[in-house]
Amino acid sequence: MELTLGKLPPEILKRYLLGMVGAPSKDLLVAPSIGVDFGVVRVGGGSSPSLIVSSDPVTGVEERIGWYAVNVSANDVATSGNSPRFLQSVIMLPEDADERMIARISSEMSRTAKGLGMTIVGGHTELTPGLKRPIVVTTVFAFARSYVTAADAREGDSLMMTKSAGVEGTAILASQAPGLEAAVVKRARAYFRKLSVVEEAAAAFSTGRVRAMHDCTEGGVLGAAYEMSYASRLGFELMEAKVPVSGETRRVCSALGLDPLRLISSGTLLLSVEKGGEDEVAAAVRRRAGSRATVVGRFLRRGGRRTLVRIQGGSEPVREPPVDELWKVLHRMR
């Protein structure tokens, strides 16, 4: 099978990675699984909290890489309904890196972690042969007595999302989009400030109406819907007409020939909400996080179809997770 840039396809993950967990342990409560953002480990008996762990790389961006690196892993842990607490990092720098690059990345990470109430506990930093730009990998930890995973959605649940589609991709690609007015580029670049889902995940979880959550990272809103449905073994119906897409995102995507529903969107949270709880979840997210939460579809029966219902009419089957639109642009730049 020919591999492409970005996440490995599910069949490759299943064939080579998911079963390779080393020594089995009865303390592994949530094992590696496609579409699930984190692992969970029992660290004590009785009522002791469990340890939630997630890792993520930042590979496609250099500007504000420290900000992105902290937020993407913090977001994954936050989809459990719990606040991220501790972080470790691996920072791999290109051979031409200087002390200014090191200072910039480390200070960005420290400020971002402090803003989220997280402590950096260690890591590793090096100059790595062959790199053209830095790569930062972060691992984030939290302690939890209760949690949800992306595998807990149920048939009939409403599919909701926060903010709008393509948040992270809009910030990353704004400067690459030809023909945009300076004011549009400036507003789009500022989308990096929307990258965190920590507060909105906590707000939604606090209602008791949320069964599953997933961060819309690589593959965007459509990719996250696929992964959540795959993890929960359900079908889904995503209504393109209901997915919020900001004016800046539309302009950036139009200029670059991209689909906003398939564009990386850290900062957008996908939720599986029990029927009747939609208004309560939307109100909680608005009150605590200042974000909107919108119903954009629904989960279908076990093994049901996975479908994107297009604005112009008709439906499009979603048989595999989409390749992120960001990779198209990066491929053109190679």
Language model features with spans:
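Beta-strand->loop->alpha-helix junctions that form or flank phosphate-binding loops
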Residues: 30-33, 216-217, 235-244, 262-264, ...
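Glycine-rich phosphate/pyrophosphate-binding loop regions near the starts of catalytic domains
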Residues: 3-162
